[in-house]
Amino acid sequence: MRYLRGEEAVTVRPEYAGTPIYVLAGFRSAMVAAKMGLGVILGGPVATQEAAARVYREHALADAPPIISSLNIAVADTPAVARDLLLPEAYAKVLAQSTGEFGALRPAGELDMDALTGQQRRRIEEALAHDVWGTVREVGEELRGVGKRLGVSEFVVTGDMPDVAGRARSEELLASLQAEN
């Protein structure tokens, strides 16, 4: 209370040691981050992250912060619902490759999948194959496997979802995974 009244200072314990800086990196940037003594958050497909993690560890300083993985992740009560949460972003990215414009994300039910070319549909499926989505059990198993492959214990969840209620449910289910660990 004395601090709140301005009568006394507070000693922070442990002492502030600085905020680590992380680089959101793919393969090449991981090596640069390692050589500069910076932490790394790996992005992209898991196979690319695996190679980047290996290079980072080969070149990192001994006291480098742990590697973090960034993945598009969606959890739902069924795999189909989880997939639909990530579909809008994959759809928009694929259309952007054809049109040059990244439009606003629309919920999966509003997407015109029939208007896509065969190549566009394949690209969407390829994009979703690099994402992590499914039920709590499925996502938990996949994240444990990815964690072992990459040697990471932390994930940054990415993936924009226009379905606000679905995103909230996904985050709730993801939090239940955290509680299990």
Q: Would you name each region that the model predicts?
A:
Residues 19-24, 38-43, 65-71, 155-157:
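Hydrophobic faces of well-ordered beta-strands that scaffold small-molecule active sites
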Residues 149-160:
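Bilobed periplasmic-binding protein-like "clamshell/Venus-flytrap" ligand-binding domains
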Residues 44-49, 97-98:
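Short, acidic/turn-prone active-site loops that include or flank metal/cofactor-
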Residues 46, 73-75, 161:
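Active-site-proximal loop/turn and secondary-structure-junction residues that shape catalytic pockets
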Residues 44, 158-166:
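Glycine-rich, proline-tolerant flexible connector loops at the mouths of alpha/beta enzymes
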Residues 1-38, 48-50:
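Internal, glycine-rich beta/alpha segment that forms the wall or movable "lid"
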Residues 52-59, 163-181:
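C-terminal helical cap(s) of enzyme catalytic domains, especially alpha/beta-barrels
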Residues 1-11, 53-150:
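An alpha-helical appendage that flanks or caps ligand/catalytic pockets
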